[in-house]
């Protein structure tokens, strides 16, 4: 796992993952909630998000001119990747066409026939990702890939998105299990404090107070 990817996972576990009883936008209930926007709209989190998504796109060999997704979850991801790459344009997909002005549903990049990547923050049922895929294709984009930041591994979301994406592929940066495991590591008070050399927190860069399991400052140890 790259350093940017590990740092992004740590930030998601610290800022975005919560245990408890929650009602999801899908209507279901869950014993945990992941609000990715607290990470993707964080100054450092935005940079890491852009780096990790850009790295994944390069590794997949997806040749795209733009990146976009359904508002609101995709918005900060789109902006982050566009800024980090300096070459991928961004577009946003409205949940419905505007009832005024141009009445368009796609905002931003507007080149019909262009190759694009669809992104989302969390995939549960996959409904928002599928809406973006369908809107992008209806507009005239050529979708070469679809991505989400965290896949919840439930509600048959992944198979649904994979089916909608064909012939393109769908990938997730992290699974909810990975984020949960990292969160549990961060909140485990039984972890010992072991230092051989001076270190800084991998999340914020401040002096670390522990390096087990990873370098953390006092604020990010729990």
Where are these regions (language model features)?
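Active-site-facing substrate-recognition patch
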Residues: 1-60
């Amino acid at each position: 796992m790259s350093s940017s990817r590990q740092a992004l996972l740590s930030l998601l576990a610290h800022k975005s993952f919560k245990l408890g009883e929650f009602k999801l936008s899908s209507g279901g209930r869950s014993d945990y909630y992941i609000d990715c926007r607290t990470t993707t709209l964080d100054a450092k989190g935005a940079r890491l998000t852009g780096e990790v998504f850009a790295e994944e796109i390069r590794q997949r060999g997806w040749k795209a001119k733009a990146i976009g997704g359904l508002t609101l979850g995709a918005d900060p991801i789109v902006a982050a990747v566009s800024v980090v790459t300096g070459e991928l344009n961004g577009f946003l997909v409205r949940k419905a066409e505007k009832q005024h002005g141009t009445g368009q549903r796609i905002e931003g990049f507007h080149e019909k026939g262009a190759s694009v990547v669809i992104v989302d923050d969390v995939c549960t049922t996959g409904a928002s990702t599928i809406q973006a895929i369908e809107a992008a294709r209806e507009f005239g984009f050529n979708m070469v890939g679809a991505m989400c930041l965290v896949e919840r591994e439930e509600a048959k979301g992944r198979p649904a998105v994979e089916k909608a994406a064909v012939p393109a592929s769908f990938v997730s940066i992290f699974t909810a299990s990975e984020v949960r495991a990292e969160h549990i590591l961060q909140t485990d008070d039984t972890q010992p404090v072991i230092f051989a050399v001076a270190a800084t927190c991998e999340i914020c860069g401040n002096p670390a107070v522990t390096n087990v399991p990873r370098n953390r400052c006092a604020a990010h140890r729990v």
